[in-house]
């Protein structure tokens, strides 16, 4: 049997985690996750599951009609009785709350918007399938986002960063010992990230077989599992080739 890729391994891990999360929700929620499975990634469904956990915990704590029953005992027809006001109270609750570990949790506009968007999808599934008569989530206005300026490194800052990785002048003697062993690898990683703009998670999922030197591109998987090719220049190519050449000379220790 062929070994699994990084993405296949992560997908299996996510499926196991998702099944555990669904068991903690009301039984009817399983239908929702089956319904959206063909159109979503496991990571997206896990995010939905976490968001629903917060919502049902809110109902259990703050709604007098549901306070005497467990989250797993909440019925779909009870959700049908909620109003827009209940959702507005939930949005207020999300700004500042305590989680199950009695830790303070705060949400900004983006976090609140994501959780409400999850509920809109959740309610829409049951409304579209005629299992509830009301869809108050569709009437809730999402919070206005205040866009944050994206901070980028300028050309000089990029050069300084790569020089520091290559030279390691400011490292301690102990750090320099590690630096000598990992410098070429670290330089390849940073040059790839800076030269292509891929996410760290996308870089983590790369295999050597995903690199196409002939066409100057790497195969990555975007959010939702979409496969795309990102192209790179000669500087990235040189850094990758230097590392792969060094890698071929490394003799792994037994058990690695």
Model-derived regions, located:
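Conserved catalytic core of the tyrosine transesterase superfamily
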Residues: 1-256
